[in-house]
Swiss-Prot record:
One GO term describing the cellular component: cytoplasm
Protein name per the record: Protein AE7
PANTHER family named among the record's database cross-references: CYTOSOLIC IRON-SULFUR ASSEMBLY COMPONENT 2B (PTHR12377:SF0), CYTOSOLIC IRON-SULFUR ASSEMBLY COMPONENT 2B-RELATED (PTHR12377)
Protein's organism: Arabidopsis thaliana (Mouse-ear cress)
Subunit (UniProt): Part of a complex formed of AE7, CIA1, MMS19 and NAR1. Interacts with CIA1 and MMS19, but not with NAR1.
């Protein structure tokens, strides 16, 4: 947790009920299962906020509707909404989402992480930073930042 909270009293929302995957149309074990919006949301919903003991879903930083998937073109976009427009943790949140998806999805997927329009004071700079491969790689070479990201990611079951 970070001292000197940016948002001392965030609104905590009820969690959405988890839906079970029921698609049994693919019976061939060699055929890859399509990836959909719900699967992506399930990967990121339990990421912890770097500042609070709550998940990104609890704080509505991410919602199922904030996920777009084009499985045919191997493209995923997650648009997240920081709890305050001057959130200093927005870069860390975006990096957590990216790392979780990089670890969870096949490497063929292009992952696009965005801040919701109008939700952050430095929206354009954040979007550029979160989608610049060299900046992301440099960030992931920083052991302190990697430790912070790993602390936010849910443990694998």
């Amino acid at each position: 947790m970070v001292s000197g909270l940016i948002n001392e009293n965030p609104i905590i929302y009820p969690k959405k009920e988890r839906r079970l995957r029921t698609d049994t149309s693919i019976t061939d074990e060699l055929t890859p299962e399509p990836i959909d919006q719900l699967e992506i949301f399930d990967h990121i919903r339990d990421i912890k906020d770097p500042e609070h003991p709550n998940t990104l879903e609890d704080l509505r930083v991410v919602t199922e509707d904030s996920v777009e998937v084009d499985d045919e073109n191997s493209y995923v976009r997650v648009t997240f909404t920081p709890t305050v427009e001057h959130c200093s943790m927005a870069t860390v949140i975006g990096l957590c989402v990216r790392v979780k998806l990089l670890r969870s999805l096949p490497s063929r997927y292009k992952i696009d992480i965005r801040v919701a329009p109008g939700s952050h004071a430095t929206e354009d700079a954040l979007n550029k930073q979160l989608n610049d491969k060299e900046r992301v790689a440099a960030a992931l070479e920083n052991p302190n930042l990697v430790e912070m990201v790993d602390e936010c990611l849910p443990s694998e079951e």
